[in-house]
């Protein structure tokens, strides 16, 4: 396991998460009103938030899907962090030994893009939160920690837009000279099919 222990935390935690958190989720499932079925197909959890907090799954709390309004011209990568990866990021930024999941952080959904630039990668990340206190908690923990760890030559800018009636955060961490600062992408909520 020496190689595993030297891997970046996000890789180590992502390998272990499905087993440990998945086992906890199945223990919850076995005690729920769904115990005579299996969580496959349409019953499969759709977010790490649902796996971490099965009661949210049980009450039908589904993630809010965000999509960028502009085409991904120049984007290297686009995806969702999710609650689990945000927790790993917080643990890494605060240098705590373990990734804790005692309470739901109020994550509603997110979407990010990474762009290439001559001075380094640029991140544009939108999050949407269940309520205003959850957004404030994110800004005063994750965003403030990121600001302190911001690489030299980078700028971190956040705004707090309302996204489809929900409290949101737009976080941009990019080289100071990145040309994308003048034309930041926007997002919208993807409505589920009826």
Predicted regions and their residues:
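C-terminal soluble interaction/assembly domains
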Residues: 108-194
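Pan-zinc metallopeptidase signature
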Residues: 2-121, 126
